[in-house]
Amino acid sequence: MDDQPRLMHSHPGVGMAGHPSLSQHMQDGTGANEGDVGRKQDIGDILQQIMTITDQSLDEAQARKHALNCHRMKPALFNVLCEIKEKTVLSIRGAQEEEPSDPQLMRLDNMLLAEGVAGPEKGGGSAAAAAAAAASGGAGADNSTEHSDYRAKLSQIRQIYHTELEKYEQACNEFTTHVMNLLREQSRTRPISPKEIERMVSIIHRKFSSIQMQLKQSTCEAVMILRSRFLDARRKRRNFNKQATEILNEYFYSHLSNPYPSEEAKEELAKKCAITVSQVSNWFGNKRIRYKKNIGKFQEEANIYAAKTAVNATNVSVHGSQANSPSTPSSAGGYPSPCYQSDRRIQ
């Protein structure tokens, strides 16, 4: 009996706690758990390092980059990334088709070019002003002043457009250069082909093109507002000078019973007013409509022109009668004054 404890003590593997297989399994389990904990800790450290990248200074980032480039496992890492890239590049190639030009942007470009805003300055505003002058049928001082004002405002719009366009192009070029340099720098660590850099540049340009389209659209709207204000042909046709309006009103009220001038009369009025025959026809058509709608309002104007016509007719009649009658005898000149003698004979 005394030898039994001695035997059990001399053979520690005997019993539940000292069984060799159980002891080995317990040791292996402990090692596996320690390995899992170690791997999780390594992943946690890596994630923590990634999260602190944005907080690093430029010198720290350069030092880590240099350490990565000098690491002995760097080529192996690059090869693994290339293999992954080869597997995924096939799905990307299908989406690299060139998109057609935006038709709206092309229309805006054509309009700005036609108005003389885009492209070299070659008098686009002057051409538009000259066209409006031809449509209005006159090149008086008022028209010249308005056309000069139009050209000045168009030049201002052009200057603003080119200034903003230059800012846009500068910002686009700076951002594109920054992205290209960044991709070239990253290509030392991960595989980036020149085609991918070109694709990224085209994406950037498409993003910036929306800003360019807004600029061109607002400029076109400003030009259209300017044209409607200064070069509207219908407004020009209504704005005859005072002398032309007087001539047309005088003819209208002197022929109020039949205010429909013949073609010969229209041509004569057009020459006097320095406007076109079609403008004369339009003026009389509008005048007849306004007169019929507001007869009472235009009655006073009709009386004024009737009185003026009567005065002119009286002056013409007086001058005509004086020209046709013989001169009145007088002692100062003309016929000699008769002299009565005592014998009552006129000598």
Swiss-Prot record:
Additional facts recorded: The displayed sequence corresponds to the ortholog of the mammalian isoform B sequences. There is currently no X.laevis ortholog sequence for isoform A.
Keyword DNA-binding attributed: yes
GO molecular function: DNA-binding transcription factor activity, RNA polymerase II-specific; sequence-specific DNA binding
Residues in PBC domain copies: 38-232
PROSITE patterns from the UniProt entry: HOMEOBOX_1, HOMEOBOX_2, PBC
Chain residue ranges for the region called PBC-A: 45-124
Major localization listed first in the record, in broad terms: nucleus
Tissues expressing this chain: Shows broad, weak expression from blastula through gastrula stages. At stage 14/15, expressed in a broad arc that gives rise to the forebrain and eyes. More intensely expressed in the lateral neural folds (presumptive neural crest) and as horizontal stripes in the posterior neural plate that give rise to the hindbrain. As development proceeds, expression progresses posteriorly along the neural folds and at stage 21, expression is pronounced in the prospective hindbrain and in migratory neural crest cells.
Gene Ontology BP, a term: positive regulation of DNA-templated transcription
Function of the protein: Acts as a transcriptional activator in complex with isoform 2 of meis1, to induce posterior neural and neural crest gene expression, and thereby specify hindbrain and neural crest cell fate. Binds to a highly conserved region in the promoter of the neural crest gene zic3. Required for the nuclear transport or retention of isoform 2 of meis1.
Compartments, as annotated in UniProt: Nucleus
PANTHER family named in the record: HOMEOBOX PROTEIN TRANSCRIPTION FACTORS (PTHR11850)
Gene: pbx1
DNA-binding region location: 233-295
Species per Swiss-Prot/TrEMBL record: Xenopus laevis (African clawed frog)
Transmembrane residue ranges: none
Protein keywords: Activator, Developmental protein, Differentiation, DNA-binding, Homeobox, Neurogenesis, Nucleus, Transcription, Transcription regulation
Stretches with biased composition (Polar residues): 318-331
Similarity comment: family membership: Belongs to the TALE/PBX homeobox family.
Protein name, per record: Pre-B-cell leukemia transcription factor 1
Complex and partners: Forms a heterodimer with isoform 2 of meis1; the interaction is necessary for neural fate induction.
Chain residue ranges for the region called Disordered: 1-37, 318-347
Region feature (PBC-B): 127-232
GO cellular component: midbody; nucleus; transcription regulator complex
